[in-house]
């Protein structure tokens, strides 16, 4: 009886060829940027090619990061950051214009960009997406909206099932944390101090408390839902301030929906959260 032949004889298995690490440039070294660095530096899958900061020589103390060992990779010049030819730029700057300029410069060089800077992306998301496509690059910005909450992914899933009519959501963690503390009897200044201590509020909280951050989030979500974004300057905003204490139970809500002739959007404080 002949043996059954399954196929041609295979060569003995050999170890897989090691993949080259992904070359990553990090723009921004604040709370989020430093956290990203602490994850990337010890991971052999990644090579940090540069870090963009305002003051490269400033002494930094973050647990788990030996800044002295990577001091030569710090720069204040975006051109130097990109000259290292990273595969990807992680853009985590706090400035809208600087972030926007860096994103454009990277995409024009065919470098993939992952951004957590909603103020930068929301300036012109359609143009940035087109720029990325024109140069064969990828632009991802889920981190710019909702922190760890998959807001953009949720909208995309809803859109795949049918047209989106509108959305309402709590879009800013700082303001809603402060509203909870105000409900508990804290003063505005106390609530703001606690928000900073909890890692919610920036040193300059104006973007949050004046509603600019929520308005930028609305623009990004509207772009995903409707393919167009309302003018950020034209979005009505109710600010949270020390002079006017909100009604107990208030929440800051971002709203955008289709209306005849376009989109209606606003940032409001609602006592019932609806």
Residue ranges, per PLM feature:
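N-terminal glycine-/serine-/threonine-rich beta1-alpha1-beta2 phosphate-ribose binding loop
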Residues: 2-109
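Structural motif
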Residues: 27, 91-93, 116, 123, ...
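Conserved active-site and cofactor/substrate-binding residues in soluble primary-metabolism enzymes
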Residues: 27, 31, 35, 76, ...
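Predominant activation on well-ordered alpha-helical scaffold segments within soluble catalytic domains
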Residues: 33, 37-38, 87, 129, ...
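Rossmann-fold NAD(P)-binding glycine/threonine-rich loop
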Residues: 98-105, 118-155
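A short hydrophobic/small-residue beta-strand
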Residues: 112-114
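NAD(P)-dependent dehydrogenases' Rossmann-like dinucleotide-binding region
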Residues: 164-176, 236
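Substrate-binding/catalytic subdomain of NAD(P)-dependent oxidoreductase enzymes
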Residues: 181-182, 190-274
